[in-house]
């Protein structure tokens, strides 16, 4: 009796530990739940462009650049109005990781995306030792197609909750699900909802 009761448990454990089960779970893409055309990877390098959600067209109003922004060494996505993109010249999306591409003269830097809680500024850890941050990749980013066929950025399964808000430094920073409860990192009354487009560089 004991043998027959343990056999099904052993079979289940064996199946779950098999390479086929591991491959199946590795192939599951969390972005597919967002509908047809959603993906956790793109084959091209792109710029992050912002478009005001209340505008009648989807024309970009600015570009986001990764800039050193906080006293704890984390870098923020900030809206810029000039052609320069700063230390990082573009972006890639690989298996849900949003990866900044260093400009050629700053090739030693590595940027790693960080978890994105509600009400927070979008942050990245940037190191100059060539190693990624251990906390990276915990929040999957996705590319989703909007009604016009443009690739838009989504995080936490949501492409509609990005906002550009003014920080105390007077920089305009990218925020996810802006909230008045933000410990003074940005001024909530300045926030405007934006879509983030992944425009091929």
Residue ranges and their predicted role:
Residues 1-29:
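Fungal secretory targeting signals
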Residues 6, 15-18, 53, 83, ...:
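Compositionally biased, intrinsically disordered low-complexity segments
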């Amino acid at each position: 009796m004991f043998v027959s009761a343990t056999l099904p448990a052993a079979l289940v454990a064996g199946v779950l530990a098999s390479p086929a089960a591991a491959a199946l779970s590795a192939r599951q893409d969390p972005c597919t739940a967002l509908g047809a055309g959603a993906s956790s990877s793109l084959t091209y390098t792109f710029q992050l462009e912002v478009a005001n959600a209340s505008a009648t067209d989807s024309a970009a109003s600015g570009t986001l650049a990764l800039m050193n922004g906080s006293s704890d060494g984390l870098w923020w996505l900030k809206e810029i109005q000039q052609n320069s993109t700063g230390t990082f010249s573009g972006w890639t999306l690989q298996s849900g990781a949003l990866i900044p591409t260093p400009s050629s003269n700053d090739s030693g830097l590595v940027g790693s995306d960080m978890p994105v809680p509600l009400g927070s500024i979008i942050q990245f850890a940037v190191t100059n030792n060539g190693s990624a941050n251990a906390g990276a990749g915990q929040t999957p980013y996705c590319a989703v197609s909007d009604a016009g066929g443009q690739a838009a950025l989504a995080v936490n399964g949501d492409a509609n909750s990005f906002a550009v808000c003014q920080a105390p430094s007077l920089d305009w920073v990218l925020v996810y699900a802006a909230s008045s409860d933000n410990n003074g990192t940005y001024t909530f009354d300045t926030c405007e909802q934006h879509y983030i487009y992944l425009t091929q560089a």
